[in-house]
Amino acid sequence: MKIKIICVGKIKEKYLKDGIAEYQKRLSRFTQFEIIELADEKTPEKASQAENEKIMEKEANRILSKIGNRDYVIALAIEGKQYASEEFSQFITDITIQGFSDITFIIGGSLGLHSKIKQKAHALISFGRLTLPHQLMRLVLTEQIYRAFMIQEGSPYHK
């Protein structure tokens, strides 16, 4: 199995990089794991809705170029389905049972995801109604993917 996270924007904060690196290392015993960082578009301070739409579309085109034809695509979106950790673990298991060996998670930039990404996705998921910086969401998602594997293993990590 291969899991990748495609995300818009770079992480500058060392503490986030360190946390993500730790979970990447832990995940290596379960899966090939990759994070693909894509450049974000500069957003003018008082951008119009039309300008924001163009920015999201440019970012969407970059994202689409990194999605494999056989990937099961999961986009993170506020309107997505929410899961408890155990349910998320089962969701990952169910995807593999359906015959998918490559799972791709997508985290948008500061403006969110363009509709064409949401339409391409097999599933939309949400980690709650809170708004989190996309850099922090990357750490949260990486930890939850690791937790999903630990739940599948019956590990005491998840209590």
From Swiss-Prot:
Homodimer. It is an enzyme of class 2 (transferase). Its EC number is 2.1.1.177. Belongs to the RNA methyltransferase RlmH family. It comes from Streptococcus uberis (strain ATCC BAA-854 / 0140J). S-adenosyl-L-methionine binds at L76, G108, F127, G128, R129, L130, T131, L132. GO terms for molecular function: rRNA (pseudouridine-N3-)-methyltransferase activity. InterPro entries: Alpha/beta_knot_MTases (IPR029028), RlmH-like (IPR003742), tRNA_m1G_MTases_N (IPR029026). It is found in: Cytoplasm. One of its GO terms (cellular component) is cytoplasm. Specifically methylates the pseudouridine at position 1915 (m3Psi1915) in 23S rRNA. It catalyses: pseudouridine(1915) in 23S rRNA + S-adenosyl-L-methionine = N(3)-methylpseudouridine(1915) in 23S rRNA + S-adenosyl-L-homocysteine + H(+). Transmembrane segments: none annotated. This is Ribosomal RNA large subunit methyltransferase H. It comes from the Bacteria. Keywords: Cytoplasm, Methyltransferase, rRNA processing, S-adenosyl-L-methionine, Transferase.
